[in-house]
Amino acid sequence: LRNSCRAYKKALEKYYPGPSLPIYASKANSSIFMSNLIASEGFGLDAVSEGELLTALKGGVPNEKIVFHGNNKSDKEIEFAIKNNIKVIVDNDHDLKRLEEISNSFNHDIEIMVRFTPGIECHTHEYIRTGSFDSKFGFGIESLGRLFEVISKTKHIKLTGLHAHIGSQIFELDPHNDLGKIMVDVILQAKDFGHNIKELNVGGGLGIKYTEEDDPPSIDEWIKTVSLSVVKACDKNNLNLPILMCEPGRSIVSTAGVTIYKIGSFKEV
């Protein structure tokens, strides 16, 4: 576990000259033990429920290193995030509306990132392909101008970052090479509406080896592709390098053990 965490940290230090923060995707294994371990390795954590938020905090992950995901957050969960100064990743219009109303009721500022679908197709199972235009997660890229304008008129919401995740169990590098350029283009778009984007979260998705035929890239190769793509796009547009975030999950925990099942019954088909 620690070796995998350190491989991400080492690769970011090697290939990305700007600030960075790897964020553990806790759905891969949410526990106080894992929260404590990744916190000790300097990672942040992404959570999708109040239970995962509480687990992260109890495990010692600093509030400012936690991001709160989800496309159907409850009011109770949003209130918890606001009260604990946890960054929220806004997924849709309903999300933003509830966040605005609740932050206004508390008279409390909140930092957010916007998740959008970059329109990148990748070769993985359709159920875990999340970067295409018809994904249930995130704002369509064509709606971002309207969204940035709406956010600029809110009282307590501060847009500090962008998030995109193209899918899981991905063996290709080209989609993530494309993602860096697209995300930097969106930084420029947000800037036109007065938003200072200081964080780019490229999600996760690095595949792991389930079968002998599987041949996923290494952590080093994946981080190199993502990092150089963002650096090149920022240099081209004379932008300061943002804080680069990524969200590894299964690539951290997958090699730490195996699950053994006892067969209970058979069905002839």
Question: Residue locations for each model-derived region?
Answer:
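C-terminal active-site-proximal or functional interface alpha/beta core segments in diverse enzymes
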Residues: 168-269
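Short, glycine- and charge-enriched coil/turn segments that flank and shape catalytic ligand pockets
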Residues: 14-18, 105-107, 216, 236-237
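An N-cap/entry alpha-helix motif that binds or orients negatively charged groups
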Residues: 2-18
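A non-catalytic, amphipathic alpha-helix used as a structural packing/dimerization or gating element
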Residues: 3-7, 146, 182, 225
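Short active-site-proximal "capping" loops at secondary-structure junctions
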Residues: 1, 28-31, 251
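Active-site-proximal beta-alpha core segment in soluble small-molecule metabolic enzymes
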Residues: 18-199, 208, 264
